Amino acid sequence: MLVRITSTNICGSDLHMYEGRTDFPRGGVFGHENLGQVAEVGNAVDRVKVGDWVAVPFNIGCGFCKNCERGLSAFCLTTADRSVVPNMAGAAYGFADMGPYRGGQADLLRVPYGDYNCLKLPPDAEERQNEYVMLADIFPTGWHATELAGLRPGESVVIYGAGPVGLMAAHAAMIKGACMVMVVDRHPDRLRLAGSIGALPIDDSKGSPVDQVLELTNGIGADRGCECVGYQAHDPEGHEHPNMTMNNLVKSVKFTGGIGVVGVYAPQDPAPQDPLYKQGEIVFDHGLFWFKGQTIGTGQCNVKAYNRQLRDLISTGRAKPSFIVSHELPLGEAPKAYQHFDARDEGWTKVVLKPAA
């Protein structure tokens, strides 16, 4: 199947590759958050038709392997490229070590197993693209973080990272009925966005985020925690610490609490600032984690496990993930957008590229 891309987002995961912190091949095409209109279909495609508006999950699944049949589309055994990692499971568009599949920051995207890998959108898709394009990755991923953490209505949650995924986790937690949603970051524009949806912003440049969480929870800690930063976490002085948010979460979450990790932790880093992380390793406070009886869930989001329900939340107005969009730009301005987004410049929260503009 060929999809004519009309909206494609820049993701924080793209920045790992943009900065040379992964083994992404030179000449590859970025872009795993894609929406567009079906332009051509192959003979084996029968449910999706030319002209349909679709959101394309960033996971590429087959629909019939053992993992896909269990709903684990992020870990497909058929589409995985085992030339680099022999026991690899999972594939994605324009993503390091996840197959030869080109991304959608282009005019057209080739989508294998088209019936399985496209989510048909409602009639209002064209005018509400900035809402529905979030179904390709970050809205399901933010939701997944709360699921991995085990969040239930009436519980408190602390989210480390107010980037797009962290803000989506906060949005998900609010929809799911969390009694308190705390979001840790230090960028004022992103903390303002967290506050705009009813979350409590915590500025870690003004003091220990752990202490601030404990103060807000009467010394007990949050019921649940979400890691939405990944291995390029930085302290307020600008130093990178791949283990920082993980260890802060162990301290911020209560005894017997749950932690969901969707921030990217790559298995290797060609240009690490911490030598230990060259092989994807961090110093983790396992002793305190064990002592507190906490649980951790990790891994890429199985987008198809959530995207239909989230589509319907958007369609009915219950969810409005486009609140994070700061810029809509033609595809030709992508280099400028990457420079600003990579620098975390003020006001550059989420960029939607428009190839047809």
Predicted regions and their residues:
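Cysteine-cluster motifs in flexible loop/terminal segments that predominantly coordinate metals
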Residues: 11, 58-129
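Glycine-rich beta-strand-centered segment in the early N-terminal region that forms part
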Residues: 1-8, 21-69, 73-74, 102, ...
